[in-house]
């Protein structure tokens, strides 16, 4: 184990002996490493057979966390390892694609689409990634129009 990975595990209260297990705060290392954009740690954890189906307290998987971090290396490693690209969280029903589209992460959306993410899945409120991406663009235009009237 590389020293920087050992340090990361220890600094985040994970077991060096059992690095894929969650810490005392009920956080999985794969999700935290993905959220922090630590592709080196993500790859290490995947090599240690980290479970791909773990979720955080909101029901999001590691792919969602990597999309949040806007980190293509983490996203690619997780997809290559076989993470559920279309996982829908229990709270809203959103997928990583829906999240990425709703927050304007164009590069991430492209990466997820290239990997085969399902564009027809909907949130519990009946929104698709396209619906939320369109809403985001409209809000951007509204903001521009309001500012031009000042």
PLM region descriptions:
Residues 1-11, 115, 124-127, 131-150:
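Ankyrin-repeat-protein effector appendages
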Residues 16-19, 52, 85, 119:
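Ankyrin-repeat inter-repeat connecting loop/turn
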Residues 20, 45, 78, 112, ...:
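Conserved hydrophobic site in ankyrin repeats
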Residues 22-23, 56, 89-90, 123:
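Ankyrin repeat boundary/linker residues
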Residues 26, 59, 92-93, 126:
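Start-of-repeat signature of ankyrin repeats
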